[in-house]
Amino acid sequence: MSSDITRQALIAVGLSLLFMAIYILIRFRNVAFSIGAFASVTTTTLMIIAVYVLLWKVMPFTMEVDQNFIAALLAIIGYAINDVVIVFDRIREEIGNHPQGDRFEIVNGALNSTLSRTLNTSFTTFLVMAIVFMFGGASMRSFTFAILLGVIFGTYCTLFVATPIAYEVAKRRREKAATKSAK
């Protein structure tokens, strides 16, 4: 891929990450959720790129950074943000139901209540993409490999990056506000 197309592709990925964070900020009106979502989706994207870099010339199929790879990255960004939105939506709902409750317990409960949905959705998506990877032909392998990685990393980051970061950022903001109001 030429350097101009590569640069434009990187700009497209970067802008999509930025707009996803803005979308979360507007949807949830919460900076902590926006930061958690941005960290999660960015981590997912960087993990996919890292695996491609590490396995380039090792795998028995092409792993070039081409239009298929960029399309897979953009698809995974959308998939991962949808996963994060579902978890954050449940957290917001539970906070609304229990405004005086312990935030850690609320977040943990919301995460647990969406866990089976998250894992089932990821498993079925992974299964379908694994079948496409095996039987879809050589031209599909790079794209489906990136999607397979994205499903794994996206699920991991939703559970273990987005939610903990959002929780910690919100906790620190509450502590800072409490300190400021105590003065």
Regions found by a protein language model. Give the residues of each.
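Alpha-helical transmembrane segments of multi-pass membrane proteins
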Residues: S16, M20, L74-N82, G150-G154
